[in-house]
Regions:
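Extracellular/periplasmic juxtamembrane segments that couple receptor/chemosensory ectodomains to their
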Residues: 193-221, 229-230, 239-244, 250-271
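Positive-inside N-terminal membrane-insertion signal
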Residues: 1-34
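Generic detector of solvent-exposed, compositionally biased contiguous segments
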Residues: 158-210, 256-258
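N-terminal post-signal-peptidase region of extra-cytosolic proteins
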Residues: 97-102
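Extracellular/periplasmic ligand-sensing ectodomains of membrane signal-transduction proteins
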Residues: 87-94, 106-180, 223-236, 253
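Juxtamembrane extracytoplasmic/periplasmic/luminal helical "stalk" adjacent to the first N-terminal
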Residues: 19, 29-91, 111-113
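Short, hydrophobic-rich beta-strand element in sensory/regulatory alpha-beta domains
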Residues: 75, 112-117, 245-249
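Generic short beta-strand
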Residues: 105, 114-116, 189-190, 260-261
Length: 271
């Protein structure tokens, strides 16, 4: 008797089955490629939006620096002036001159919301806001706000405010009229919260600009001005930055079409 070895051969794969398998693989590959492409597109869109937001934030920061420069230049137009220096440093300051040339001029010509002049002892000799003169008691509500700015002017050691570029100082290099008094001049500008709103705050020492013999020894008087950042300010900045929808809000805008950021002042607070 002979033994016989048998086996069941595997059925041959039909051409239709191979084609179906190939089509399935192709479909999976196309789907995977589509997912990858979509991910790349979404990432590119996210990266573009992030880059645009960062650029717009940088533009706004630069606009604030330019606003501080403008504020200091506006202050300089009256603070560095022989007649103003004499009116302030006389034994009895000329209050009518101060109201006209500092209070009314700076508020109505340039839109300064608060104007303050402090004597060498940091006591207010003049304050103007809301279209009227204010008392020394009115200044007390702002003393803590202005304290770090005044400390910089008086060169008190220890910086408590964010360092900003000195655009104003860079513009004084060609100033020859003031001469030696300019060497003792001090100025600073910052973004702070004043009366619950963000504001540009500028401080400048008061000097004669022609007659150097008028300059008295000791610490100088200081002019402080406040320019509140409100909707009108933002609209002006938005036009210059080509950001027509620039706005200020107390809460974050949840609209995905808008990019928002907290407005941090130079003392580290959120305005």
């Amino acid at each position: 008797m002979h033994s016989t070895v048998t086996h069941r051969p595997k059925p041959a794969r039909s051409k239709d089955g191979e084609l179906r398998h190939l089509m399935n693989l192709t479909a999976v590959g196309v789907t995977l490629a589509g997912v990858i492409l979509l991910s790349v597109i979404l990432y590119a869109a996210w990266a573009a939006n992030s880059s645009a937001s960062a650029r717009e934030i940088a533009l706004f920061g630069n606009a604030v620096n330019r606003s501080i420069l403008r504020l200091l230049n506006e202050q300089k137009s009256v603070a560095w002036w022989d007649e103003a220096y004499t009116a302030i440093t006389d034994a009895k300051p000329n209050t009518e001159f101060l109201e006209t040339e500092f209070g009314i001029f700076l508020s109505e010509t340039y839109g300064h919301d608060i104007v303050v002049i402090l004597n060498p002892d940091n006591k207010p000799i003049f304050m103007y806001s809301g279209g009227a003169r204010r008392s020394a008691d009115d200044f007390e509500r702002y003393r803590n706000v202005f304290a770090p700015v005044l400390a910089e002017i008086r060169q008190v050691k220890g910086r408590s405010l964010r360092l900003r570029p000195d655009l104003f100082g860079a513009n004084q290099k060609n100033y020859r009229t003031i001469g030696s008094p300019l060497q003792s001049a001090r100025w600073t500008g910052h973004l702070l919260t004043v009366d619950g709103a963000p504001a540009a705050v500028g401080a400048l020492t008061i000097l004669p600009n022609v007659d150097k013999s008028l300059l008295k020894p000791g610490r100088p008087h200081v002019l402080i001005s406040v320019n509140t950042i409100d909707e009108a300010y933002l609209q002006e900045q938005g036009r210059s930055l080509l950001l027509s929808d620039l706005t200020l809000g107390k809460t974050a805008n949840t609209n995905s079409e808008y990019a928002g950021m907290p407005l941090e002042t130079d003392d580290g607070k959120i305005a």
